Amino acid sequence: MRSVHFVALGDSLTEGVGDPAGDVWRGWAALLAGGLAEAGQVEFTNLAVSGAQTRDVLERQTPAGLELRPDLVSVVIGVNDTLRHTFDIHAVTTRLDEVYAAFTRQGTTLLTACLPDPGAMLGLPGALARPLARRQRAVNEVVHSLSDRYGAVHLHASGGTWLTDRALWSADRLHPGERGHRQLAVRFHALLADAGLATGRPPSPEPEFPTPSRSASLLWLATAGTGWVARRCTDLLPQLMRLAANELRHRAWGTSSRLDLHASAAVSEALAALSTPDQPEGGSADAGAQRRRTATNRTGVPGTACAAAGRSAAPTTAITG
């Protein structure tokens, strides 16, 4: 029996931050890999790097991943883009489209996810949190649309009760702990199994290692965790202050909805500017269309419907079930 090759692209979430296994990070992708096929029939390569943005995935991780010609590739990325002053939804859209298209041309199955708003996870005040939330919603809308466009197996992980279950999250409040990583792996496995793409035993939702003590978590947050947040947010802070001031002005004038409309329009323009996707190697237009029609998200709703539903789908699509 031919082995299944799974390649993971992304940032610290996919690298496994929050799920230590000995002296290294493990994470949801490694946990998922063990359930894709029977023991000894899976090859797993994790190319994710902490701090990566969509540019890094396109320029560095994708070429390395394409050389491996995987059967399955996960592309879970975008939060770090929202934490930079250079955030540009047009650039994010173009990069993700190029990454998805490159693997689709090889006939590789795409695995994607939309992600929580970092401002809400950090518990930032409203005026600071809303600009970040608007950015993350924009990224998620793009991921929804492109996942449908390329027939990806997509997990809606941006909302629901799992976001407020502290047992699932690490001390930094941005990364899942072991339980959270296991929840991601379990839910991704369920989607792949439904599509006939995972035949191994699903990952266990129960942790393998003891939960870090409160003192250990606080020590990590005060040292490595604080540094992690600072490195990713320092260049954003001056701009975030300006965004917050703008947020407060619009709120005082009763025109906050204009900011949301502007963000939605930018997403629509970015998606409209994309060219028609290429077909897989040896594939046909009909085959590509069939993949897009049959791709489903966590709720079993076709990708286009989930994208249209947007935030209203979040409460019923949490990955904690």
List where the protein language model places each region.
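Structural beta-sheet core signal
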Residues: 8, 75, 111-112
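Alpha-helix N-cap and loop-to-helix initiation/capping positions
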Residues: 23-24, 87-92, 127-135, 172, ...
